[in-house]
């Protein structure tokens, strides 16, 4: 009988990487590290259940463990002033041993609905809360397809609805080619604990194809006749012939395609993004302009600006690293107003000290705040410290600070376009 293989294991080394990456000394250390990795993952999925963890990657050396937690709500894992992250590090150090250094990196997901584990966990939670298993699957399927997935397949099995005989039921929409190795398919299995028994939830999500086809199945190959080998004749000396003049090759000039018309709204948006902000250069620096990559922030107190220069980030901002595949110097969550925040990278270049009124007159046109909010925020301050960056990139749209588990902005930094 044909059986369905795990799509994650089938694609390892083709379009998917191992989630545990290390090299052990001997068989004894291999067994020890395998058990530790399993305990680490089970503990993280249990403690960080509210953060919707998709998967956990582990990289090891002999004296260090790097753990990368991919989740949809990183603020819950980090906690207020990194309190939850410190507790999690301490708990994980008991698993791997105190002599081994533990580094925990929290990474946000671009599209949480593309994660099969998150969707399977949502269906399992709905079943545990006595929600209809059919409606739970249909809602999850609509959510995944609306986010741009190519297809999804769900399956629940057990005593569905509390009946005496166990059975299984599932739904499928879109394209889910399990045997096509170039298809990026994510698979997860979760369990729903109910009063009448255990119910298993399986989810397959097709994110799209990673490689294109080189040729179609209908391609026809022409058969060429095999030429017989001719007998070699003795070489006769011939007079050298003069090379014939070759005709000049005239290249055809391709006609350029007419440019597509650009909408006025998109053009205006591009101009705003690529806006050049004039800034006062530091002493001894060359005169020039700070481009849009130089994002500017204004601080109410000098100590907050000094903390950024000294890289004492724990006192004023929340931050987390990213994977070594996409190295980033500093990823922060900084405020756009007193109620919203943005995830992004900020590499500080210099600080310019101005009066509050001068700071608004010089940089207020690029601010996301209104003049009323600006005056209310800086009413007790005389000077403002303008932080100008070398490079800065925004990785999310402005969100409420509650989604980052924050009630106040990190030390009063304000984001300016």
Curated annotation (Swiss-Prot):
The keyword Ribosomal protein applies. Residues 250-417 are annotated as: Insert. Residues 221-264 are annotated as: Disordered. The keyword Transferase does not apply. One of its GO terms (biological process) is translation. Pfam families: KH_2, Ribosomal_S3_C. One of its GO terms (cellular component) is cytosolic small ribosomal subunit. GO terms for molecular function: mRNA binding; rRNA binding; structural constituent of ribosome. It comes from the Bacteria. Residues 221-232, 249-264 have a biased composition (Basic and acidic residues). Keywords: Ribonucleoprotein, Ribosomal protein, RNA-binding, rRNA-binding. Residues 40-110 form the KH type-2 domain. Binds the lower part of the 30S subunit head. Binds mRNA in the 70S ribosome, positioning it for translation. Part of the 30S ribosomal subunit. Forms a tight complex with proteins S10 and S14. Belongs to the universal ribosomal protein uS3 family. This is Small ribosomal subunit protein uS3. It comes from Malacoplasma penetrans (strain HF-2) (Mycoplasma penetrans). The gene is rpsC.
């Amino acid at each position: 009988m044909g059986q369905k293989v795990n799509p994650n294991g089938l694609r390892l080394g083709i379009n998917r990487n191992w989630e545990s990456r290390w090299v052990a000394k001997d068989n004894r250390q291999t067994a020890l590290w395998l058990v530790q990795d399993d305990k680490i993952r089970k503990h993280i999925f249990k403690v960080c259940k509210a953060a919707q963890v998709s998967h956990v990657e582990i990289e090891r050396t002999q004296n260090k463990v790097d753990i990368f937690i991919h989740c949809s709500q990183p603020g819950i894992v980090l906690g207020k002033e990194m309190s939850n992250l410190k507790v999690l590090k301490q708990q994980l150090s008991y698993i791997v041993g105190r002599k081994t250094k533990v580094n925990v990196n929290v990474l946000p997901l671009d599209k949480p609905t593309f994660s099969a584990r998150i969707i399977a966990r949502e269906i399992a939670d709905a079943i545990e809360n006595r929600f209809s298993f059919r409606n739970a699957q249909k809602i999850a399927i609509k959510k995944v397809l609306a986010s741009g997935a190519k297809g999804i397949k769900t399956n629940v099995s057990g005593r569905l609805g509390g009946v005496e005989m166990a059975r299984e039921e599932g739904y499928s929409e879109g394209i889910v080619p399990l045997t096509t190795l170039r298809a990026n398919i994510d698979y997860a299995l979760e369990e729903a604990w109910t009063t009448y028994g255990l119910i298993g939830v399986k989810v397959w999500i097709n994110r799209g194809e990673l490689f294109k086809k080189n040729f179609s199945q209908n391609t026809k190959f022409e058969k060429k006749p095999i030429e017989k080998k001719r007998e070699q004749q003795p070489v006769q000396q011939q007079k050298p012939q003069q090379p014939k003049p070759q005709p000049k090759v005239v290249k055809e000039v391709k006609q350029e395609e007419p440019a597509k018309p650009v909408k006025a709204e998109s053009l205006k948006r591009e101009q705003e993004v690529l806006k050049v902000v004039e800034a006062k250069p530091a002493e001894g620096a060359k005169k020039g302009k700070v481009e849009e990559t130089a994002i500017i922030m204004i601080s109410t107190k000098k100590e907050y600006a000094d903390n950024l220069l000294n890289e004492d980030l724990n006192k004023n901002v929340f931050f987390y690293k990213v994977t070594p595949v996409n190295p980033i110097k500093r990823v922060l969550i900084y405020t756009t107003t007193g109620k919203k925040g943005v995830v992004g990278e900020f590499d500080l270049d210099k600080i310019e000290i101005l009066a509050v009124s001068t700071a608004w007159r010089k940089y207020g046109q690029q601010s996301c705040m209104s003049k009323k909010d600006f005056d209310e925020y800086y009413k007790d301050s005389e000077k403002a410290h303008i932080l100008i960056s070398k490079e800065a990139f925004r990785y999310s749209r402005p969100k409420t600070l509650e989604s980052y588990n924050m009630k106040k902005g990190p030390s009063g930094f304000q984001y300016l376009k």
